Curated annotation (Swiss-Prot):
Protein name in the entry: NADH-quinone oxidoreductase subunit K 1
Organism ancestry: Bacteria, Pseudomonadati, Pseudomonadota, Alphaproteobacteria, Hyphomicrobiales
Subunit field text: NDH-1 is composed of 14 different subunits. Subunits NuoA, H, J, K, L, M, N constitute the membrane sector of the complex.
Organism of provenance: Rhizobium etli (strain CIAT 652)
HAMAP family reported for this sequence: NDH1_NuoK
GO molecular function terms noted in the UniProt entry: NADH:ubiquinone reductase (non-electrogenic) activity; quinone binding
Amino acid sequence: MVIGLSHYLTVSAILFTLGVFGIFLNRKNVIVILMSVELILLSVNINMVAFSHFLNDIVGQVFALFILTVAAAEAAIGLAILVVFYRNRGSIAVEDVNMMKG
């Protein structure tokens, strides 16, 4: 059995849908929202690498590596902000984020 472009796009669509559902169904926990955003970015990367492979163009793979780097930095900064927020407020609920106003 040959794994074609449609298989990669199906996996990517499933990951993207899970990420969107994770954002919209769980509005309480910031960590789950961050993980859902990472799932969405991963699905975009799978699309880029799959199209890059099947079109014999390396630009998509290079851009996917760039997106992975930015996503790792985004996750590190987001988790650092969550740690500081938890130390100050004692919770990481999304409802408490509006209390961060000056």
